[in-house]
């Protein structure tokens, strides 16, 4: 027995030692740290050209391409999406007939026996610009099929397409999420924002794949098609380069390039997306979000939402809430009412972890987009806090920042940890200036989000100023580097967050911390707070 105990101690001691070397939120709040800027890292923010073989069409006829997976509301169902046929772009375009080809997924637990079949629906969307000299776009046929009745934590093989046309994909596979319980979680959840399709993006995805995620969260700003004119001319700053255009144009083929580049990953690992400002894509008749809402499948119906712009889902013992910053969010809005109902239904004995995501951050100390989402914060922060939100992921700011636990700008041991992860690699390059740097505090009236409007960013700092004169207390760590993060739930109270930088080796850590829930110290406040 003594020998067995000694052997067990020797086996566990490296893990214990390693765990002790990683800080936890129990050690906080932390003194704010700024990692000095490495000026050599701003290059490579250049989009892949349409001649790159990774973005070119590699199928013929109506064979499926741009295959992707997304979760439904729980472990027993999943969405499979793909595109068939070729997009059209020109002054006059004629949409393909979505009823001309079937939407079928054949699947099973054995690669050589795909004995089950599911059918879904198909659609096309158009991006129309009724102005002289501008080109219109209509997509290939987009298919969405929901597979149901799946077993948890199980590998399934599948192929998609139309078997009657002999237009089927090769066989792919995915693993379903574990059942919702306090003891079962996805192995690794990759988190990335503001991805785009640059050479930096390729580095981000290469590093991300090395970490073998079971699920991917993309926190807005996907293809950056709206940095292009309809003829394919591009710029890092659309408004600077094209101030005279009659409407903010887009080049929709960039979405197809993005889907092709990502297929090797998204055909195996579910991708959950929330919209960013680059997905708005205004067109004729004031239509918005057409590409975003058409190309991805969302569990909005399953989660009681009426919009692709906000929804929720479970992944094991985690309840994820994906919120829309570019649709009404005030306390009289449909989204706010939906959020109240969604949070009220969460059973923390089944899904102990509550993780929220939306695009523009509430807690960021960079000059870029500083306090831009203050009105959303005023509307929703108390509600999310009262239901004990554990972690919040945001993008929009092209850098990395992790907060101390915070609520209403005050350090609070029961507040969420806010993580800005808008460093995926897009062509607008990194954010490098901080609002507390001398001369870098923006003019207050320039900060409100131009889409939702309104000004809510009143003075709030200890010296009653718009900006801090030092790195804010809520900011634990900030660094301007491209990268991605990995979230690993260890149990119902401990989660490991790791941030990886593109310039490092795939296994080198840029930031790492255990995020620890304290349900005994931080009981839920929703019965004490009036949200009427």
UniProtKB/Swiss-Prot annotation:
Q: Which residues bind substrate?
A: 277, 396-398
Q: Does the keyword Endoplasmic reticulum apply?
A: no
Q: Which GO terms describe its molecular function?
A: 4-phytase activity; acid phosphatase activity; metal ion binding
Q: Is this entry keyworded Ubl conjugation?
A: no
Its domain of life reads Eukaryota
Where is Zn(2+) bound in this sequence? 221, 277, 359, 396
Q: Read off the InterPro entries from this record.
A: Calcineurin-like_PHP_ApaH (IPR004843), Metallo-depent_PP-like (IPR029052), MPP_PAP (IPR041792), PPA-like (IPR039331), Purple_acid_Pase-like_N (IPR008963), Purple_acid_Pase_N (IPR015914), Purple_acid_PPase_C_dom (IPR025733)
Indicate the residues that form the catalytic site: 369
- From the UniProt record, list the reaction(s) this protein catalyses: 1D-myo-inositol hexakisphosphate + H2O = 1D-myo-inositol 1,2,3,5,6-pentakisphosphate + phosphate; a phosphate monoester + H2O = an alcohol + phosphate
Q: Where in the cell is it found?
A: Secreted
Q: Name one GO cellular component term.
A: extracellular region
The protein's Enzyme Commission number: 3.1.3.-, 3.1.3.2
Binding annotation for Fe cation: 194, 221, 224, 398
Instruction: Describe, from its UniProt entry, the tissues in which this protein is expressed.
Output: Expressed in roots, stems, cotyledons, leaves, flowers and siliques.
Q: Mind listing the UniProt keywords for this protein, alphabetically?
A: Glycoprotein, Hydrolase, Iron, Metal-binding, Secreted, Signal, Zinc
Where does the secretion signal sit in this chain?
A: 1-19
- One Pfam entry name: Metallophos
Required co-factor? Answer: Fe cation; Zn(2+)
Glycosylation sites recorded in the entry for this protein: 136, 200, 231, 264, 286, 301, 491
Q: How does it assemble?
A: Homodimer.
Say what the protein does: Acid phosphatase activity with p-nitrophenyl phosphate (pNPP), D-myoinositol 1-phosphate (Ins(1)P1), phytic acid and Myo-inositol hexakisphosphate. Low or no activity with Glc-6-P and ATP. Confers shoot growth stimulation, enhanced salt and osmotic stress tolerance, and ABA insensitivity. May modulate ascorbic acid (AsA) levels by controlling the input of myoinositol into this branch of AsA biosynthesis.
The protein, known as: Purple acid phosphatase 15
Q: Which organism is it from?
A: Arabidopsis thaliana
Give me the gene this protein comes from.
Answer: PAP15
């Amino acid at each position: 027995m003594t020998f067995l105990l000694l052997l067990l101690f020797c086996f566990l001691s490296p893990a214990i030692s390693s765990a002790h070397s990683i800080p936890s939120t129990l050690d906080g709040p932390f003194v704010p740290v700024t990692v000095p800027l490495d000026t050599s890292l701003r290059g490579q923010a250049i989009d892949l050209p349409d001649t790159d073989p990774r973005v070119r069409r590699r199928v013929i006829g109506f064979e499926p391409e741009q295959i992707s997976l997304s979760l439904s509301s729980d472990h027993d169902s999943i969405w499979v999406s793909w595109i068939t046929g070729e997009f059209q772009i020109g002054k006059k375009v004629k949409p393909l007939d979505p009823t001309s080809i079937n939407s079928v997924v054949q699947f099973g637990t054995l690669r050589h026996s795909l004995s089950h079949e599911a059918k879904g629906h198909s659609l096309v969307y158009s991006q129309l610009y009724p102005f002289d000299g501008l080109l219109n776009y209509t997509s290939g046929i987009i298919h969405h099929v929901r597979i149901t009745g799946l077993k948890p934590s199980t590998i399934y093989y599948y192929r998609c397409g139309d078997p009657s046309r002999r237009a089927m994909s090769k066989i792919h596979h995915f693993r379903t999420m574990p059942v919702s319980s306090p003891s079962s979680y996805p192995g690794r959840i990759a988190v990335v924002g503001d991805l785009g399709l640059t050479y930096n993006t390729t580095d981000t995805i290469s590093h991300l794949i090395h970490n073998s995620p079971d699920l991917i969260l993309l926190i807005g700003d996907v293809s950056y098609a709206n940095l292009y004119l309809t003829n394919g001319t591009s710029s890092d700053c659309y408004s600077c380069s094209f101030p005279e255009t009659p409407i903010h144009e887009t080049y929709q083929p960039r979405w197809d390039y993005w889907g092709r580049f990502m297929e090797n990953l998204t055909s195996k690992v579910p991708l959950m997306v929330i919209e960013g400002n680059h997905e708005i894509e205004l067109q004729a008749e004031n239509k918005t979000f057409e590409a975003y809402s058409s190309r991805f499948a969302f569990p909005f119906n399953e989660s009681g939402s009426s919009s692709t712009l906000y929804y929720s889902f479970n992944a094991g013992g985690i309840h994820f809430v994906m919120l829309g910053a570019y649709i009404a969010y005030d306390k009289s809005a449909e989204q706010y009412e939906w959020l109240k109902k969604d949070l009220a239904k969460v059973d923390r004995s089944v899904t102990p972890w509550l993780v929220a995501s939306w695009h523009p951050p509430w807690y960021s100390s960079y000059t870029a987009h500083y306090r831009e989402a203050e009105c959303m914060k005023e509307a929703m922060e108390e509600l999310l806090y009262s239901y004990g939100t554990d972690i919040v992921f945001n993008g929009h700011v092209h850098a990395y920042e992790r907060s101390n636990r915070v609520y209403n700008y005050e350090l609070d041991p029961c507040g969420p940890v806010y993580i800005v992860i808008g460093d995926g690699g897009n062509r607008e390059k990194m954010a490098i200036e901080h609002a507390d740097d001398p001369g870098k505090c923006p003019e207050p009236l320039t900060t409100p989000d131009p889409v939702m409007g309104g000004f809510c960013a009143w003075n709030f700092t200890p010296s009653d100023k718009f900006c801090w004169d030092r790195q804010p207390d809520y900011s634990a760590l900030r660094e301007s580097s491209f990268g991605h993060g990995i979230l690993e739930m260890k149990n119902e109270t401990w989660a490991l967050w790791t941030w990886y930088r593109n310039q490092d080796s795939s296994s080198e850590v840029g930031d790492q911390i255990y995020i620890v829930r304290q349900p005994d110290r931080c009981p839920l406040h929703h019965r004490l707070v009036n949200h009427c």
